[in-house]
Structures are given as structure tokens and as C-alpha cells.
């Protein structure tokens, strides 16, 4: 695994619009569907990352504790040719296994990840 330093947009940054495939519902999900009266947590994750795997229980806890107070969305922008375990079916299967229901979106072109300056999971 290579060492890539994380970057993060400043808290309070205005939401960058997106419309991506939701691997949970198997429909597209638009940022317009988020409740504008609540803050949003946008996580860039992937199935195979050991750091993300380590935090599965924390992600579940955040969802359980805050699902009614904030919008929660996860986005994977990995290249599935290089990481087939990060494909939409595998994303759906992982969410089902973890018992999560918030959107897990697939950013196939990495356009949204680049817009959010996501460099690693």
C-alpha cells in the first residue's frame, strides 16, 4: 500500500452536487435528495482498504447514532479494473452484510472524488 496523505475540504464547505449510481437501491442518487436542513457527512471509502475495513464498526455506530440528525453518504471512486472487489455488486454485498442502508455510491469516472479533492480512503 502506498502512502498517500489525506486532504479534506474545510468543514462547512458548500456541498458539491452529484448524481451517482447507488449500489444499495440500484438507482441513481442525487445530492438534491439530501435534506438541506441537516448537515451532511460525505465519506470517500472503498471495500478493500484496510483502514476502511478497520473502521466498519465505527461507520455502523455513526449511522446508528446520527442517521436522524445528519445526511450520510459513502462514495467509492476506485478503478474496478484494478480493484474488482470495489465494484458495484461487491459494494452492495458489503452494505448488506454490514446492515447499512444509507447510500453507497459508485463514482465510476472519479469526477466527484476529484471535485471533493478525495485522494485516499
Where do the language-model regions lie?
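N-terminal "domain-start" segment that seeds a small globular fold
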Residues: 1-32
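Short loop/turn microsegments at loop-to-beta-strand junctions
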Residues: 16, 40, 120-121
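Flexible, glycine-rich phosphate/dinucleotide-binding loops
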Residues: 27, 50, 81
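Short active-site neighborhood of thiol/selenol oxidoreductases, capturing the structured segment around
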Residues: 30-55, 59, 72
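Loop/turn elements at helix/coil->beta-strand transitions in domains of secreted/extracellular proteins
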Residues: 38-39, 68-71, 100-102
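Structural microenvironment flanking redox-active thiols in thiol-disulfide oxidoreductases
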Residues: 54-96
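Short, internal strand/loop/helix patches
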Residues: 92-121
Amino acid at each position: 500500500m502506498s502512502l498517500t496523505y489525506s486532504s479534506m475540504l474545510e468543514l462547512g464547505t458548500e456541498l458539491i452536487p452529484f448524481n451517482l449510481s447507488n449500489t444499495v437501491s440500484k438507482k441513481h442518487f442525487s445530492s438534491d435528495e439530501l435534506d438541506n436542513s441537516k448537515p451532511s457527512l460525505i465519506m470517500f471509502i472503498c471495500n478493500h482498504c484496510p483502514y476502511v475495513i478497520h473502521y466498519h464498526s465505527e461507520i455502523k455506530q455513526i449511522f446508528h447514532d446520527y442517521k436522524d440528525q445528519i445526511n450520510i453518504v459513502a462514495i467509492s471512486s476506485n478503478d474496478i479494473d484494478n480493484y474488482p472487489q470495489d465494484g458495484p455488486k461487491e459494494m452492495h454485498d458489503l452494505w448488506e452484510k454490514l446492515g447499512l442502508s444509507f447510500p453507497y455510491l459508485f463514482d465510476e469516472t472519479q469526477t466527484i472524488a476529484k471535485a471533493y479533492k478525495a485522494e485516499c480512503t
